[in-house]
Amino acid sequence: MVLTVVIFQSGVATVNAQEMGLQLYSLRNEFPKDVPGTFAKIKSWGITNLEDGNDGTFGYTQEEYNAMLAENNLKIVSVSAPFEELRDSPETVLERAKNYDAKYIVCFWIPHKGDDFTLEDTEKALTVFNNAGEYFAKDGVTLVYHPHGYEFGSYNGELLIDHLIKNSEYFDFEMDVYWFAHPGEDPVEWLRKYPKEFKLMHLKDCQKGTKGNKNGSSNVETNVTLGTGQIDIAAVVAEAKKMGIEYLFVEDESSKVLWQIPESIEYLESLDLDKD
């Protein structure tokens, strides 16, 4: 169903062509206890589209896991893969994506020493991502990279994240608004700077007064209900709507996730994105 405002109806949440979803890492503590019950909970929230957290199938066979997804009208549209697997075994990653008929593969982290993310790390990542992305593209699957803030360091006057984006021939990007705001950046300005490069998004808000950094670390308890923190979520979603970002995944890593996600959904439902 495609409408002109955010709605949560019949298990589907859409913002025009953008389909709302959930990043399953949010429920990393719930899944090991009760997979069927957790899927049922997600369904009750009106969520349909999912991005996995690279946690496997929790002891179920692939067929059993897929059956539980189908029973709850859930679909994994994006699968995650560690950097090393993209480098050493991209065929395994692609097979995992095919298990769900997912059209996106996302990598969340580029290995580097401590807080020192360098140009050499960036160049290594470009090689791995472009090689894997070209391989996936032959099967109609898109590789995206999810920055975590450490990419905002500079080399010879250029931000390393700019270097990544400008040389991303066979891969695109997933913006986590928390991890763009945490280093002191404006997510909306980055969306406008690169209007074609961001294909996916994580919607995650940050507690007011939280001090940021550029090392990719934070206290997960600073994750708060969307619209109550220090990030202008409404402006980000409005810009994402203009750009046609396909999936907007709600993510909440805090211990308050079970009541904050429904509150976040209610907030998104309240937005009037047709207002200028």
Model-derived regions: residue spans:
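C-terminal helical cap(s) of enzyme catalytic domains, especially alpha/beta-barrels
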Residues: 257-276
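Conserved, mostly hydrophobic/aromatic
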Residues: 22, 42, 50, 69, ...
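Acidic-and-aromatic substrate-binding clefts and catalytic sites of carbohydrate-active enzymes
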Residues: 27-33, 52-62, 81-89, 113-117, ...
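Bacterial Sec-dependent N-terminal signal peptides
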Residues: 1-19
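N-terminal pre-domain/capping segments
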Residues: 13-104, 172, 273-276
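N-terminal small/glycine-rich loop or linker at the start of catalytic domains
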Residues: 16-24, 112, 210-215
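Acidic/histidine-rich catalytic cores of soluble enzymes
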Residues: 138-230
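Active-site acidic/histidine proton-transfer and metal-coordination neighborhood
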Residues: 48-49, 83-172, 258
